[in-house]
Amino acid sequence: MGFSGSRAWSKWLTICLAITHPFSVTAKSAADYYVHSLPGQPEGPLLKMHAGHIEISPETSGNLFFWHFENRHIADKPRTVVWLNGGPGCSSEDGALMEIGPYRLIDKETLNYTEGSWDEFANLLFVDQPVGTGFSYGSTEHYVHELDEMASQFVTFLEKWFEIFPHYEPDDLYFAGESYAGQYIPYIARAVLDRNKKQDVQANNRIWNLKGLLIGNGWISPQHQYPAYLPYVYQEGVVQAGTQEANLIEAKAAKCMKELNVEDTTGTVHIPDCEDILQAILDYTHKGKRCINMYDIRLTDDYSACGMNWPPDLRDIQPYLRRKDVVKALHINEEKQTGWTECAGAVGSSLKARNSKPAVELLPGLLEEGLPILLFSGQKDLICNHVGTEDMIKNMKWSGGTGFELSPGVWAPRQDWTFEGEPAGIYQQARNLTYVLFYNASHMVPFDYPRRSRDMLDKFLGVDITHIGGDPADSRIDGEKGPTTSVGAHPNSTAAAEREKEKLNTAAWKAYYKSGEVALVIVAIAAFAWGIFIWRSRRKHQSSGYRSIYPMLGLNSTGSLGQISHKHSRRNGDIEAADFDETELDDQPSQAFLSRSSRDGDAYAVGEEGSDEEDGASDGQQPMFDQSRGEEGRS
């Protein structure tokens, strides 16, 4: 081609790379989030996982962290359960590593499988939210203050998550969580349903199939749950009525009732005068250096932690999630994270919901729109006790009835639930609402009873293993066996395996298409530049043609770009989808090539260790509880 032609080609190539560089840096695919190995993992094949940050607010560097586990088996259809812990400001890695996830820590370095984990027939998506919680990060000046802000932030996250993982978007979608997630989940559900009604969403056929909500020991209705503290501790014998201390607690309860006795409930999600009731109860139980555990009244804890040091797994989780190899495996942005903490006091101090109504006011509308909701309670939890939840249900009106009325004055019966021959709890249901009371369980029901909680989940999701295989669990309601469920690992039937294979093959092409959109732009720009160059070359060197550039590009004499593209398309499609063959990973470009640049800055944090006391004092109030567990302590 000659020196001038070579120089021209080099110039055009430089221009193309300059134009396409921003796209190649910022675009991410599923491959960037794939967890290749997990430190301390048990023997056996690694579960299919993705983890990392998704930017939801570039202007504030707001990023939410997620950890996704693909279901081990598919029953009759694909389902995704999104799990949120509460706080506000407490990490959903509590749920991942202590409750419903497939792994639990034996010690600071070793993981073990959990029998009864929720990923048997459902994909699990754990999200640290809102911004500032757990591994999530962003400008501290832009932490959310209201519940509708939180819900909007989360919908943005889901939009972006489904762009990267489009093969999960058609799944039946469920939101689950506990404690302050009783505020999060109804607000998020409302935002999702409103989103689905928008014309542009319907036109693009991107409606999310929201199928149900599960809330455990939820903080949902302060109007019913604050006043329930006294009846609960009297009923459980924690406080003796008529004593001087009991009279003091009753005086605080009376003061709280004045705060609650208002027509406009805006701003009543968190009431300091009402929080004093719980603190007075804990003070009453203070004996020596011990006090009752507010999350499990059968236990005690150091005063004034009173449950903040529980569960015992906590002492292993923080060191594990701060290990450099774990941080790397989960694709944590090392420039931003300053060490995982269970609860971020700054998030709780910011999210006071002073202009938000309690989530209980959203429940009737959600139920009337046909959305099934399951509320479950651990019998021995004090902070979000079952007496308050039951009182809330009793007084809630929806679909032409009050509480669990089947008809005027006729209530749905409380049905006895037995699991593997032992009394497990009570079921009660009517008009899309189900309530489950777990006997002898704490604030974190799945921590105590993972297999029973999985049985509850499978019943709610409608999983029936009759045509799948496996040993059924002996679970009965009023002595009757319902759909056959299983809470142990088992093989799928051939038919189910074929359905899963077909789903994953489809997923591969969808993910390839999504991640290839940016590549298409790059190819189009390069093709345009190529065309201009060829046109100019033909004019200048019409006699010699342009074959001489082939060796430079590694092409054959046909000038076909398609052969290189075809050679790599299948392999790239596989790794960018969720369907991974780990033997293919050795053939992929280096991690340095796949890595993405990250912003630098000192104004962002992920709940620095030791910052909680400062966070708690930021609004001028002395926090009731140790900020390491969140101001309300409702994790």
Curated annotation (Swiss-Prot):
What protein is this chain from? Pheromone-processing carboxypeptidase KEX1
- Gene3D superfamilies hit by this protein: alpha/beta hydrolase
Cytoplasmic compartment ranges equal 536-635
Q: Which PANTHER family match?
A: PHEROMONE-PROCESSING CARBOXYPEPTIDASE KEX1 (PTHR11802:SF190), SERINE PROTEASE FAMILY S10 SERINE CARBOXYPEPTIDASE (PTHR11802)
Topological region Lumenal: 28-514
Location comes to: Golgi apparatus, trans-Golgi network membrane
- Source superkingdom: Eukaryota
- Membrane disposition: Single-pass type I membrane protein
Task: Name a GO CC annotation attached to this entry.
Answer: trans-Golgi network
Q: Where is the active site?
A: S179, D381, H443
Q: Which residues are glycosylated?
A: N112, N432, N440, N492
**Catalytic activities:** Preferential release of a C-terminal arginine or lysine residue
Compositional bias per record (Polar residues), positions renumbered to this chain = 483-495
This entry's Gene Ontology molecular function terms read: serine-type carboxypeptidase activity
Ranges for region Disordered: 472-497, 583-635
Q: Which SUPFAM superfamilies match?
A: alpha/beta-Hydrolases
Task: Give the signal peptide range.
Answer: 1-27
- Report the InterPro entries cross-referenced here: AB_hydrolase_fold, Peptidase_S10
